[in-house]
Regions:
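N-terminal Sec-dependent export signals
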Residues: 1-32, 36-38
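Acidic, Ser/Thr- and proline-rich intrinsically disordered linker/docking segments
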Residues: 5-6, 27, 37, 42-58, ...
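Intrinsically disordered, low-complexity, compositionally biased regions/tails
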Residues: 21, 36, 60-61, 65, ...
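Residues that act as N-cap/strand-start positions at coil-to-secondary-structure junctions
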Residues: 21-23, 31, 75, 82, ...
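Domain-scale macromolecular recognition modules
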Residues: 25, 33, 43, 76-77
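Flexible coil/linker segments and helix-coil junctions enriched in charged and small residues
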Residues: 46-77
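Short, compositionally biased strand/turn segments
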Residues: 65-98
Length: 154
């Protein structure tokens, strides 16, 4: 679970269909860029782990200091989820995940799809997907939809 750092007033604005303008000194903004969402998030990474398992045994050899072993080994693969904690910033120009590992900075032109969940939001940029666990996935989705509407107005 993730505890929110988004002010309650900002969350209410987003739910009402308005984009709040938030301030931070942690993110370097481009000209005309405004922050509309700041919150703690966890980037979930699916990692494939390979293990080598050996089945067999060994016995003392004929001469001192030697061993005789027999058996066979095989590689076993399994996937596990790795959590990368950080801060998710959504501005009117880009989506930034600031973290020590697996951080990213993406502009909206590369955003392909959004899948909201109750406590997460999956964002796809081309062939790369990021599953971001947040306090409220519907708020993240609402911010992205509002920005999308504003960007389509000529």
């Amino acid at each position: 679970t993730v505890t929110t750092i988004l002010p309650d007033a900002a969350s209410q604005e987003i739910i009402a269909g308005r984009l709040p303008i938030l301030n931070t000194d942690k993110l370097f903004l481009k000209r005309g860029e405004k922050i509309h969402f700041i919150d703690k998030a966890i980037n979930m990474e699916q990692k494939t782990v390979k293990e080598f398992r050996h089945v067999g045994g060994s016995t003392p050899g004929l001469f001192e200091g030697t061993r005789w072993s027999s058996g066979r080994g095989r590689t076993v693969e399994h996937t596990e989820l790795v959590q990368h904690r950080g801060i998710l910033y959504i501005t009117n120009q880009r989506i930034v995940f600031q973290a020590t590992e697996w951080g990213f900075d993406k502009t909206y032109r590369y955003l392909t799809a959004i899948t909201p969940y109750s406590n997460a939001c999956e964002m796809q940029f081309g062939n790369k997907s990021y599953c971001m666990v947040v306090a409220d996935g519907s708020v993240v989705n609402q911010v992205l939809q509002l920005i999308k509407q504003r960007r389509q107005i000529p």
